[in-house]
């Protein structure tokens, strides 16, 4: 029991330190540092569709279904933005502002991001070890759906993810670059 508790504490400490390190790479005003423009999503990456992705691609990724969101709750100040994004794996679109009720880690990632590829297996482990106490939601940003599903499968991340091919969450979450990890309160 003590080993498991230490493992959980160790995993959460790594996530927290990663957040601090990543936050230090941006600018104070939330603008892009020189040379850090995010690529645009390919035309085939259309939210709400599986264009380019087969059922086999979705099943191979082994992502858990996206959380159910409440369409009727009002967004909260400094909360998740009021955006509805397509589920990357199986599930209905998710209204970010409507996902509440549990502590949550939100991880913004992309298949073209080298640090994301290194971080996602660890994020998946934290999720599997703490899923009873802590929800996790990935946001695949500025990416191709097929490439994102392939990376999800190759990193064994398993936590549910939504797709944001147009990078709409950048302003609402003050995302400077990827990976970005945020901790969200239940309320």
What are these regions (language model features)?
Residues 132-147, 157-167:
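Thiol-based oxidoreductase modules, predominantly thioredoxin-like and allied folds used
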Residues 94-117, 123, 136:
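Short active-site neighborhood of thiol/selenol oxidoreductases, capturing the structured segment around
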Residues 96, 146-149:
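Acidic helix N-cap motif at the loop->helix transition within catalytic regions
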Residues 83, 94, 108-109, 151, ...:
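Conserved hydrophobic/aromatic "anchor" residues
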Residues 1-86:
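N-terminal targeting signals for export/organelle localization
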Residues 150-157, 163-187:
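Thiol/disulfide oxidoreductase modules built on the thioredoxin-like
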Residues 75-77, 83-104:
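A short beta-strand-turn-helix
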């Amino acid at each position: 029991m003590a080993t498991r508790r230490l493992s959980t504490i160790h995993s959460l400490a790594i996530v927290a330190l990663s957040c601090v390190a990543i936050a230090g790479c941006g600018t104070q005003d939330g603008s892009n540092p020189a040379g850090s423009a995010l690529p645009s999503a390919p035309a085939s990456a259309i939210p709400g569709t599986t264009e380019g992705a087969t059922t086999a691609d979705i099943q191979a990724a082994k992502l858990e279904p996206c959380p159910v969101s409440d369409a009727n709750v009002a967004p909260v100040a400094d909360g998740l933005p009021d955006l509805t994004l397509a589920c990357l794996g199986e599930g209905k679109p998710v209204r970010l502002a409507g996902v509440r009720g549990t502590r949550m880690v939100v991880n913004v990632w992309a298949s073209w991001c080298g640090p994301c590829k290194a971080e996602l297996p660890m994020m998946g482990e934290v999720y599997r070890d703490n899923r009873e106490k802590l929800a996790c939601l990935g946001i695949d940003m500025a990416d191709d759906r097929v490439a994102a599903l392939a990376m999800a499968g190759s990193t064994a991340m398993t936590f549910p993810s939504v797709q944001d091919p147009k990078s709409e969450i950048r302003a609402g979450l003050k995302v400077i670059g990827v990976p970005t990890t945020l901790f969200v309160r239940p309320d």
